[in-house]
Amino acid sequence: MVVKFTKSEALHKEALEHIVGGVNSPSRSFKAVGGGAPIAMERGKGAYFWDVDGNKYIDYLAAYGPIITGHAHPHITKAITTAAENGVLYGTPTALEVKFAKMLKEAMPALDKVRFVNSGTEAVMTTIRVARAYTGRTKIMKFAGCYHGHSDLVLVAAGSGPSTLGTPDSAGVPQSIAQEVITVPFNNVETLKEALDKWGHEVAAILVEPIVGNFGIVEPKPGFLEKVNELVHEAGALVIYDEVITAFRFMYGGAQDLLGVTPDLTALGKVIGGGLPIGAYGGKKEIMEQVAPLGPAYQAGTMAGNPASMASGIACLEVLQQEGLYEKLDELGAMLEKGILEQAAKHNIDITLNRLKGALTVYFTTNTIEDYDAAQNTDGEMFGKFFKLMLQEGVNLAPSKYEAWFLTTEHTKEDIEYTIEAVGRAFAALADNK
């Protein structure tokens, strides 16, 4: 059992003097789990982390998804080292970016053409620009609770009604920008149709997480994505899939291939970088030809397609092509799901568990979670206590009730067995303090 975080606490105190909030992304703070100093990690290997105090953890954060092959995978590490030795940035085309683009196209048939950028945020931001250029329209639709990066246009919350215009979800986002966004609930065809009937003639595109990953793991209802495509295309708008989380997470390729639904444009990130910063977007040839230098939609980047990220991404996909990896993730995910549910029943803890293959979310509620409203109405205080109990057990989770647990190819059955035992001890402690 982990008993001390002395160095993490001291480091956080020092970080607060120099870094805003002591963290470089707000999701890393412990604000959503009752506060305290976030645990500072020193190194990772395989499915494990070691913090600055020397405590070891089984890692289910996986850097919020990208680290599907585990930490410091030797094939990826070797590729990064070689790229670094050859120079990390040229500002010119390279053979690596061509090879990687071909690999992505082969894995995801909806990508006629691709363009590399530096983050998922940038990828989504640019698909919106391209969709606007192609359609000549300005408004964007999105689903409530789905996170598409931190650019102004997508930091928008729903208005007072299901088919109203949005309101800013962050200080610094002008109301004028929020007025270009319509937010509707996920998995609700009728509300989507209502919004399109009202605003469809002004909509350039709809942003879709084909499998939601930002208020936990939530799958679309049967036929929902097909209906989205039908209704949006009837309105003359484009369908953009944000596969920053989902691509290569559930199968080799995208969620669009897993679910059999094809978008017009796709945004990628996270897993495809093998742990290094990356983003990419792509889609139908006639739409992508809106992008400069062929078309009028401008997008550029000094670091875009840099050799280190290209080499890391290629190596990651090469690992993921190995036979049986995704089957292993599904098998371990099923084992973990079964064990958590058994422990919840044993200790009379109310949970709902959503899982798809090697990713899952534990919600402290008895309600079914199919949309953001349902995810919001779960017990965040109980999750915060559970999170800290699991940390004491040496199990690292994301510090938010909305985030997923991500398995990696390096987790073992022994890791899952230990985690289930740790969950049992945490649930027992929660039950004792009800």
Curated annotation (Swiss-Prot):
Q: Main location per UniProt? A: cytoplasm
Catalyses: (S)-4-amino-5-oxopentanoate = 5-aminolevulinate
- Which Pfam families does the record cross-reference, listed alphabetically? Aminotran_3 (PF00202)
The Gene Ontology biological process annotation of the record reads:
protoporphyrinogen IX biosynthetic process
**Gene Ontology MF terms in the entry:** glutamate-1-semialdehyde 2,1-aminomutase activity; pyridoxal phosphate binding; transaminase activity
Q: Provide the alphabetized UniProt keywords.
A: Cytoplasm, Isomerase, Porphyrin biosynthesis, Pyridoxal phosphate
Q: Which cellular component terms (GO) are annotated to the entry?
A: cytoplasm
First-tier enzyme category under EC: isomerase
Where found, per UniProt? Cytoplasm
Question: What cofactor does this one take?
Answer: pyridoxal 5'-phosphate
Q: In which pathway does it act?
A: Porphyrin-containing compound metabolism; protoporphyrin-IX biosynthesis; 5-aminolevulinate from L-glutamyl-tRNA(Glu): step 2/2
Residues spanning the membrane? none
Q: What is its EC number?
A: 5.4.3.8
- Record-listed N6-(pyridoxal phosphate)lysine modification sites: 270
Q: How does it assemble?
A: Homodimer.
What PANTHER family does its record include?
GLUTAMATE-1-SEMIALDEHYDE 2,1-AMINOMUTASE, GLUTAMATE-1-SEMIALDEHYDE 2,1-AMINOMUTASE 2
Similarity comment text for this entry:
Belongs to the class-III pyridoxal-phosphate-dependent aminotransferase family. HemL subfamily.
Provide the protein name.
Glutamate-1-semialdehyde 2,1-aminomutase 1
Species for this entry: Bacillus anthracis (strain CDC 684 / NRRL 3495)
